[in-house]
Amino acid sequence: MKRKKILYLDQFAVSNMYNAVPTSLWGQLRSIIIEKVNNRILSCPMPLEHLYETLGRSNMGEDGNESIEYSKQIAQQHHFFSEIAKGTTFYGYEEIAATEIMMLLRQGNVKPIQSMYFHKAYYADIEILDIYANGHKFNKENHFYNQELFKDVNGLREDMKKAGQELSKPDKSLALDYLCKIQTRAYIEGLKELCRKGEVNVRGVQCGKINIPNKVDLLLKLLCDKKLDKRLAQKLICELETHGFEKIPSMNIRSSLNADMAVNGKSQTPNDVIDIDRAAIGLRISDYFFADNEKKLAIERCQLDKKYQTKIYSAKKDSVSSLITELSEL
């Protein structure tokens, strides 16, 4: 059977398509996607990030009161995505990264196998309206966690800002490489501690009233669950010290986009964290990847589209038209 093409859709694309006028540009895109999905030519797996963002969107109207109609609208958008996802969903970032790492350690490279990146999961069909009323509360707590995740990158940005002058292109390239490299430190330190202790203690990050696992510890725990022993841990330390994340697609994408923001003096926001995780999860395996224009430009600056042979699209009119043409030819 011929391999299906993969289209990664972000929240903005879904919200623009779900009730678009059929003759509009977004309506045409929706129509061609539904056609190709039903013909089993195209697959549009749902990312976990879609669920995070759906739950996190405030259900309060302009007057500050609960808006049932707005809640229904968000639920309808989720239902539309569920219909085209056909029960397929992307794995989370740490799961994908752990799988890529183990393949690299055992086989010497990371092959783009679809089952490594997405699978059948119940949350693609979840009735979102039942739990949406408390979603905005989750989002507030999640923002505390996101602040922990990107505080180091924002610190790097401030250090570079204090260093003074605007970097030339060669200097930016060197700075990008450097910032990607230093993001390996926490993982190398964690692996060395794993080798010493023989186990992983998953620390919690306090996020308002809830406690969320530390991302480094969580990845190491998943690696141990996938039978990472001391020999493989030492091999991974050597890999990270020598090549950084270069051979691990999800981690390479994530660290590159984090570094790009720091080099260009941009402060990360909770939405940036979600968007970067979206790219880390879906960019490598997708044939077509939808992102906001800023992230599209960042992906292209880092040449990640070329490295992983993925076509990037944004909500700009000419970009949407180009995607419609591309999908029509499948």
Language model: regions and residue ranges:
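Long, positively charged, glycine-interspersed low-complexity recognition regions
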Residues: 23-33, 40-41, 68-70, 75-78, ...
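Non-catalytic, alpha-helical, charged scaffold/linker segments
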Residues: 77-222
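A short secondary-structure junction motif
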Residues: 15-24, 49-68, 100-101, 178, ...
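Long, positively charged binding patches that form subdomain-scale interaction surfaces
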Residues: 192-277
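Metal-dependent nucleic-acid phosphoesterase active-site entry motif
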Residues: 1-27, 167-199, 245-249, 253-254
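Conserved glycosyltransferase catalytic-site signature
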Residues: 11, 15, 48-52, 272-279
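Extended charged low-complexity segments that act as oligomerization/scaffolding linkers
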Residues: 1-7, 28-115, 316, 322-330
